[in-house]
């Protein structure tokens, strides 16, 4: 079996799904043209970063969807320690995949490709490792190390 770039595949599939939803629902941009993920990225490149800009609108929409899916996942998790219920692991896994759908949509709406996402992830991972090595806590929290991640 050939090795594939799975993160790239996820980003491609999600972009295609989003474009299909925009088309099916006849969602349009402020210019009246049919909306697609490329249009959101182009708005980013034009610097349309204000509260009424297309990127902000769709980042907000995808964040709300992500929060909704997180709430659905939370409903699947048991908290009554006195209960004899068991978790539905299959549905929990599906809810986690739903979270990935909207996390990927957020990344795409922020103009990230799979490669850019991976690069930022590994840079932030190094920051997190360094924080742990230094005994990270609220008292030592310094967001300046995040500023160097570009």
Q: Predicted regions: what is each one?
A:
Residues 1-150:
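Flexible "arm" and connector segments at domain edges
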């Amino acid at each position: 079996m050939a090795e594939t770039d799975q993160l790239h595949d996820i980003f491609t599939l999600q972009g295609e799904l989003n474009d299909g939803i925009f088309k099916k629902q006849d969602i349009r941009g402020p210019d009246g043209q049919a909306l697609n993920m490329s249009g959101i990225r182009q708005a980013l490149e034009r610097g349309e970063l204000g509260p009424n800009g297309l990127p902000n609108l769709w980042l907000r929409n995808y964040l709300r969807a992500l929060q909704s899916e997180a709430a659905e996942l939370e409903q699947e998790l048991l908290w009554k320690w006195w209960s004899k219920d068991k978790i539905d692991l299959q549905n929990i896994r599906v809810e986690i995949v739903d979270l990935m759908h909207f996390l990927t949509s957020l990344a795409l709406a922020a103009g990230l490709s799979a490669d850019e996402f991976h690069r930022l992830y590994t840079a932030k991972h190094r920051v997190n490792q360094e924080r742990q090595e230094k005994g990270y806590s609220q008292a030592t929290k310094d967001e300046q190390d995040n500023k160097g991640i570009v």
